[in-house]
């Protein structure tokens, strides 16, 4: 098969997803990386979907109140809920980035575990992981503040019209903390932050190990005597590739 950017596509196979290969203990922290990466990506996806649902509902609420208000008032009403819209967008963006950075590392580790990467790539990967972790943390803090202490409000109409609009369009509620979906969004996002931080830490530890001993299996990189077939090999110090 073709080789793209140095990756031999013939090495990709469905068998790589099997338990025996995925959790092969010969590779340093391979099992742990797969577990925490998947937790960060999957729980992040759940947080992203919940935030997207909330964003969609509050955006529709804004339009519905504006359009319906002309039937109960001479002036159109405006719903002010930009805070939760901004919090949802921030959550969505950083959860997508979590899936991008750790998803890429997941598949590289899955299909090409012995590949050695240039230093600039390792540095960029670690730097992006730190930035994304910080971004998820910021998204979690902002979302917590908005959902637990803020609420949307209506302007442009009298109090009677406001009450009627709220009665007609009661869901999602103007008080963000009164909606279970928003609470679920917060819980999932904080769990995502913890898993993302753990993924970043274990990525740093694995990168340091690979820089010192190379990405070869422990039976090769530590014993450094012969392969599983009994063929002698010599390892270049720190490179992680047989010569």
Predicted regions and their residues:
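Short, highly charged low-complexity linear segments
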Residues: 60, 107, 160-165, 199
